A protein has these predicted regions:
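Glycine-rich phosphate-binding active-site loops on the catalytic face of alpha/beta enzymes
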Residues: 35-43, 96-108, 151-171
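C-terminal helical cap(s) of enzyme catalytic domains, especially alpha/beta-barrels
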Residues: 47-49, 111-112, 164-184
Length: 184
């Protein structure tokens, strides 16, 4: 469908295991429009942090180059925690970032909107580095509008909250509530 983008998210260092082909092999076979790289471990249920500099830097840069060569139409996204992650994403040739919004979400949910300045700095830095911006983690009906109002967010990832909200409002009404926030 037009306007629908297929994104595969995972750890690029994940090797084949049982029926799993390995992350890089999977994305090269499927060729999604977007590939989001997260530093999760194999047994991790959900992301709890983004990438930062480390001993994996050169290997990660090589994997990004390989993925760009093998899947020419795929954009490569790097899951990051903070402003330091923006420069890192640019240096290793990612096309976009996904801001880990766990800290943002927790702050907003606790009534502390001072976090908005930090998120705005990340957005501004990403724009200065010509990176597109996605965001996700713990976003919900209460905190999403703050992020949307900042502008320049290309895409948001909302997971668990949709299911929880669906128990209260029903699935269709929940989706309409999220779309209303995003569109307004």
């Amino acid at each position: 469908d037009e306007g629908v983008e297929f994104n595969i998210e995972g750890n690029p260092f994940s090797k084949p295991y049982n029926e799993f082909l390995g992350f890089c092999e999977l994305v090269q076979m499927i060729l999604p429009e977007q590939i989001t790289l997260v530093p999760d471990t194999i047994n991790q249920i959900t992301s709890d942090h983004g990438w930062s500099r480390g001993s994996h830097d050169e290997d990660l840069k090589k994997i990004i180059q390989l993925l760009k060569e093998k899947s020419k139409n795929s954009k490569i996204s790097l899951f990051i925690d903070d402003i330091n992650g923006v420069k890192y994403a640019a240096e290793i040739n990612a096309d976009l970032i996904e801001i880990h919004t766990g800290k943002f979400s927790n702050s907003i949910n606790n009534g502390d909107i001072s976090i908005l300045n930090e998120v705005q700095e990340i957005i501004d830095s990403a724009l200065n580095h010509n990176l597109l911006i996605n965001a996700g983690h713990d976003l919900n009906l209460t905190n999403l509008h703050y992020l949307v109002e900042m502008g320049n967010i290309n895409e948001v990832s909302i997971g668990h909250a949709i299911i929880i909200d669906s128990l209260h409002y029903g699935f269709e009404e929940t989706i309409l509530k999220y779309l209303n926030i995003i569109r307004n």
